[in-house]
Structure formats: C-alpha cells, structure tokens
UniProtKB/Swiss-Prot annotation:
One of its GO terms (cellular component) is endopeptidase Clp complex. PANTHER family: ATP-DEPENDENT CLP PROTEASE PROTEOLYTIC SUBUNIT, CHLOROPLASTIC ATP-DEPENDENT CLP PROTEASE PROTEOLYTIC SUBUNIT 1. It is found in: Plastid, Chloroplast stroma. The gene is clpP. One of its GO terms (molecular function) is ATP-dependent peptidase activity. The active site is at S101 (nucleophile), H126. Signal peptide: none annotated. This is ATP-dependent Clp protease proteolytic subunit. Keywords: Chloroplast, Hydrolase, Plastid, Protease, Serine protease. Its main location: plastid. Gene3D superfamilies: 2-enoyl-CoA Hydratase, Chain A, domain 1 (3.90.226.10). It catalyses: Hydrolysis of proteins to small peptides in the presence of ATP and magnesium. alpha-casein is the usual test substrate. In the absence of ATP, only oligopeptides shorter than five residues are hydrolyzed (such as succinyl-Leu-Tyr-|-NHMec, and Leu-Tyr-Leu-|-Tyr-Trp, in which cleavage of the -Tyr-|-Leu- and -Tyr-|-Trp bonds also occurs).
Length: 202
C-alpha cells in the first residue's frame, strides 16, 4: 500500500510550534534538490524555479542536486543545465544510482571540482535520439537537422567540462557508454568518488 511522501516536523525561525511538511519540502529549505525521475518539462520547471528562488533567498550558500535519472527530454535537460550555470551559488551535483543520457549531462554541469558520484553509481552518455520514426520525410529531415545541432551543443559542453578532446567525446556519443563511478571520474564527468563509511572523499 503506497504511503505517499513522508512528512517531517519543521520549525520556522521565531516560531514555537513545529509544522509538518513533506520531506522534500524540508530538504529544499536546506538547499538539497532531487532529480529522481525521467527529465521532462514538469521536473525541469520545478528545479529551475527552486534554484532561482533559493538563489534570490541567499546567493552565497551552495546548492546540492542529487541525481538518479534514466535521462529524458533534451530541451528540459538543457534548461536545468543553463540555470545551473546562471545562478550565483555553486551547484554541487551528486550521482546516486544512475545518471544516464540527460542525467549525465546535468551531472557534468555541476560546479567543476564539486561533482560527486557515490561508489556504486552508474553513468551513461550517448547522442540525442529522434522521436519521429514514422514522420513524413520533410519533417524527418527537419528533425534530423535539429538533432545534429543539439548533438553539437551537447558535445561542446562535454568537451568543455570534462577536458577530453573532441574526438574522444564524439566517439563516446556514437553509442551507449556506461561507466562506473571511478570510470566517470577518469572521464572527467565527476571530480570525486565518495568513500564508503567515512566522511572523506577520494
């Protein structure tokens, strides 16, 4: 039986009595954000709104984005990435579980030196895919041109943020490339791999 989103007590500054809020609302107040689903317009708008609001509230405290996502739509993913670059606070990205496709693109978009993967996390990169398998030829050609532009944009970002040469990133994006946390670190997608049972990072 589903139990819904758990609620936890929260006491606002200056208030005597605590109120019950859902756990994600409580964590947002600590600047901890979550991408735990496929990337679509709804979650993109939520995360963009939260990042902008929290930046207005305090532009000196870092934000932390936890990622466990199979990927999703390219444009909503790019809007999350662009917002991360735009807001004044540094955005830490933390991969737990899987960061695939647009999930890995958002992961690599964290502040360089502040991108982390948990030890058993997996990362996957590949090129954007088309949704027009049975479209008329004209529409298919237009979409193919747009896909090439999007692929070029994504490739440039991976090159810039991983430090890998263009030919390496282009080759990797030809197919699904899965990586362990350590391989993602070697590839420049994350900077740190968490060490189990300690507060240190490797």
């Amino acid at each position: 039986m589903p139990i819904g989103v758990p609620k936890v007590p929260f006491r606002s500054p200056g208030e005597e009595d605590a109120i019950w809020v859902d756990v994600f609302n409580r964590l947002y107040r600590e600047r901890l954000l979550f991408l735990g689903q496929e990337v679509d317009s709804e979650i993109s708008n939520q995360l963009v709104g939260l990042m902008v609001y929290l930046s207005i509230e305090d532009d000196t405290r870092d934000l932390y984005l936890f990622i466990n996502s199979p990927g999703g739509w390219v444009i909503p993913g790019i809007s999350i990435y662009d917002t991360m670059q735009f807001v004044p606070p540094d955005v830490h990205t933390i991969c737990m579980g899987l960061a695939a496709s647009m999930g890995s693109f958002i992961l690599v978009g964290g502040e360089i030196t502040k991108r982390l993967a948990f030890p058993h996390a997996r990362v996957m990169i590949h090129q954007p895919a088309s949704s027009f398998y049975e479209a008329p030829t004209g529409e298919f050609i237009l979409e193919a041109e747009e896909l090439l532009k999007l692929r070029e944009t994504l490739t440039r970002v991976y090159v810039q943020r991983t430090g890998n040469p263009l030919w390496v990133v282009s080759e990797d994006m030809e197919r699904d490339v899965f990586m362990s946390a350590a391989e993602a670190q070697a590839h420049g997608i994350v900077d740190l791999v968490a060490v189990e049972n300690t507060g240190d990072f490797a």
